UniProtKB/Swiss-Prot annotation:
Biased composition (Basic and acidic residues): 1-26
Name of the protein: Probable NAD kinase 1
Enzyme Commission code: 2.7.1.23
Keyword vocabulary terms for this entry: ATP-binding, Kinase, NAD, NADP, Nucleotide-binding, Transferase
One of the protein's GO biological processes: NADP biosynthetic process
Length: 532
C-alpha cells in the first residue's frame, strides 16, 4: 500500500466507525438492530486488522505506530460494546418472558381456585363487597386525629339466583366487619400506621385488632356440620335444629347423611334442607349465613373443606377431644346462639393454604392439578420408603434449603398447635400472618423451624436425583404421591375461615393452650422457703 492510498483507507475506516456508531444508537430498538450492530462491529474489526496486518512503508514513523495502537483499541472497544448491549437485550427479554409467565400462572391459579362452575357467582359476590368508613364511627372512635383505620367490610345481600336449587333459600343476610378498639371508651384510638417526622421513623402503637361482626339483617339460614358416629352429637343436633326452627324461625341446612338420619327418626324434620350433588354444594356460600359445627377440631376442618371459596362465619361447639378451634360449650348452646344471632361478636380470621401439585411431565407451570385448600397444614413425608426424604425448598424463587429427614410440615398459624407443634414448631396466635416451615426429624442438628411472612410463595420439589419418592397429605387426608421432578406450590389463600369467638381471639387462644395442652403447668414454689 502506498502513502497516497493511506488517506483513502483511513477515510474508509472512519466511515465504518461512523456506521458502527449509528448502529449502536439503534441497539435498544430490538433484537434485529442488535444483530446488525454486532455484525457491523465484527466487520469493522476485521477491516482494521487487515489494514494493520499490511506492512507500512515507513514502519518507524511514530504517527503510524500511534495510529495502529489507536485502531486496535477502537476495535476492541467496539466489540465489547456490541457484546455488552446484546447481552443486556437478551437478559431484558428473558426477564420479560419470566414476568409474563408468572402473571399468566397467577391468573390461571386464581381461575382454577374459584372453580369453573362457581366462577360467575364468585365474581358477583366480589363485586358486592365494598370498603366503607362510616362518618359516625369515625367521629365517635377517632376524635380529631384525621386518620382512622376503622374501615369496615360490608357484605351486601346478593339477589336471588334463578339457577339455584329450589331446596336452598336464595337470600343471604348482610353483615359488616370492623376493627375493635381494645374496649376504649374515651374516644381515643391507636392508629395502625408508620409515621415519618423530623427524619425519624416511628411506628404508632397498634390496637389489638379484634374483628367484630355485626349483622345488618337477620340471619335466615344455618348450616349444621356434625361429627359422624356419635350418639351424643346426633341427639344435640336434633335438639338444636328443633329449637332454631321453633324459636328463631331459621331455615336449617344439613349434610345428606344427617338429613337421612333425622328423617328416619321423625317426619317432623321435613323442613330441613340439604344438597344432592357437588354443583349445589359449591354454591352453599351464597345461601348460608352461618355454620354450626358439633364435634372437635376435625369437624371444623371438614366444614372448611366443603368451601373452595368464601366461607360463612363458623360457630364451633366443643364435642370433641382438645378443641383448639371449638370454644363454645354445648351445654349453653341457647345463650351462645342468641349472642351470635343478635351480634355483634368477635371473630378470628384463620388463614388457609392454597396448594398446587405440578407434575414433572407438565409442559409448564400453568399445568397444575386442582388446587387444595388446607386450614392446618400440608405434610410431605417419606411414606413407606426406607430412605430419607430429599426435598429442595424455594421461597419466592430464592433457595431456602434442602430437607433431608422424615419430611417437612408447611403450616398455617392456626395449625401451629397441631402436627407442627409435635415436630418442634412454635405455637403462634392464629391471627398472626405467617407460614410455618417445620422439618420432621431432620438429619441435621442445626435445622431449626422457621416462620415466614404470609405473602411468600413456597415451592417444595423432589429432585431428580432423589433416592425415593415423597407423599403429600393435606389436613391429614387426600394423600398424593410426589415422584422425582414433581413440585408442590403453597401460598396463602384469599379465602380465610372466620370462626366466632366465645370472648375474643386472644382470650380464646390462651384458654385453648392452657386447657387443651396444660401449657407450662407445674406446681407453684412454696413461699416459706429460704430467701435472699
Amino acid at each position: 500500500m502506498s502513502l497516497d492510498e493511506l488517506p483513502h483507507k483511513v477515510s474508509d475506516e472512519r466511515v465504518n466507525h461512523d456506521t458502527v456508531t449509528s448502529h449502536e444508537s439503534e441497539i435498544g430498538s430490538g433484537s434485529i438492530s442488535t444483530v446488525s450492530s454486532t455484525v457491523s462491529s465484527v466487520e469493522s474489526e476485521k477491516a482494521a486488522y487487515e489494514f494493520l496486518a499490511q506492512t507500512p512503508i515507513k514502519s518507524t514513523d511514530a504517527h503510524l505506530v500511534e495510529f495502529s495502537e489507536a485502531m486496535r483499541t477502537v476495535a476492541k472497544a467496539l466489540r465489547r460494546v456490541a457484546e455488552g448491549k446484546a447481552a443486556a437485550q437478551a437478559e431484558a427479554e428473558e426477564w420479560r418472558r419470566k414476568y409474563e409467565l408468572e402473571m399468566a400462572h397467577k391468573q390461571q391459579r386464581k381461575i382454577k381456585g374459584y372453580g369453573s362452575c362457581a366462577n360467575n357467582e364468585l365474581e358477583k359476590l366480589a363485586s358486592q363487597l365494598t370498603l366503607e368508613t362510616p362518618a359516625s364511627d369515625q367521629a365517635g372512635c377517632c376524635g380529631n386525629h384525621g386518620i382512622c383505620s376503622h374501615e369496615v367490610l360490608q357484605d351486601e345481600s346478593p339477589g336471588p339466583n334463578p339457577r339455584s336449587s329450589h331446596k336452598l333459600v336464595s337470600r343471604k343476610a348482610s353483615f359488616r366487619l370492623s376493627w375493635g378498639c381494645n374496649g376504649d371508651k374515651n374516644g381515643q384510638h391507636k392508629h395502625d400506621f408508620v409515621s415519618f417526622e423530623k427524619g425519624d421513623i416511628t411506628t404508632a402503637e397498634r390496637s389489638n385488632k379484634q374483628i367484630l361482626l355485626k349483622w345488618e339483617s337477620s340471619p335466615q339460614t344455618v348450616l349444621f356440620i356434625t361429627k359422624p358416629n356419635s350418639n351424643s352429637v346426633h341427639v344435640l343436633c336434633a335438639e338444636m335444629v328443633r329449637w332454631l326452627k321453633e324459636h328463631k324461625k331459621i331455615n336449617v341446612v344439613v349434610e345428606p347423611r344427617v338429613s337421612k338420619e333425622l328423617l328416619t327418626e321423625d317426619s317432623y324434620y321435613n323442613f330441613i334442607q340439604t344438597w344432592d350433588d357437588d354443583e349445589e354444594k359449591k354454591m352453599l356460600h351464597t345461601k348460608v349465613d352461618l355454620i354450626v359445627t358439633l364435634g372437635g377440631d376435625g369437624t371444623v376442618l371438614w366444614a372448611a373443606s366443603l368451601f373452595k371459596g368464601p366461607v360463612p362465619p363458623v360457630v364451633a361447639f366443643s364435642l370433641g377431644s382438645l378443641g383448639f378451634m371449638t370454644p363454645f360449650p354445648s351445654e349453653q348452646y341457647r345463650d351462645c346462639l342468641d349472642n351470635v344471632l343478635n351480634g355483634p361478636f368477635s371473630i378470628t380470621l384463620r388463614n388457609r393454604l392454597q396448594c398446587h401439585v405440578i407434575r414433572d411431565a407438565a409442559k409448564d407451570e400453568l399445568e397444575t392439578e386442582e388446587p387444595i385448600l388446607v386450614l392446618n397444614e400440608v405434610t410431605i413425608d417419606r411414606g413407606i420408603s426406607s430412605y430419607l426424604t430429599y426435598l429442595e425448598c424455594y421461597c419466592d424463587s430464592s433457595f431456602v434449603t434442602c430437607v433431608q429427614g422424615d419430611g417437612l410440615i408447611i403450616s398455617t398459624t392456626s395449625g401451629s398447635t397441631a402436627y407442627s407443634l409435635a415436630a418442634g414448631g412454635s405455637m403462634v396466635h392464629p391471627q398472626v400472618p405467617g407460614i410455618l416451615f417445620t422439618p420432621i426429624c431432620p438429619h441435621s442438628l442445626s435445622f431449626r423451624p422457621l416462620i415466614l411472612p404470609e405473602y411468600v410463595t413456597l415451592r417444595v420439589q423432589v429432585p431428580h436425583n432423589s433416592r425415593g419418592q415423597a407423599w403429600a397429605s393435606f389436613d391429614g387426608k387426600d394423600r398424593k404421591l410426589l415422584s422425582p421432578g414433581d413440585a408442590l406450590i403453597c401460598s396463602i389463600s384469599p379465602w380465610p375461615v372466620p370462626t366466632a369467638c366465645l370472648v375474643d381471639s386472644t382470650t380464646d387462644f390462651l384458654r385453648s393452650i392452657h386447657e387443651g395442652l396444660h401449657w407450662n403447668l407445674r406446681k407453684s414454689q412454696s413461699f416459706d422457703g429460704p430467701r435472699d
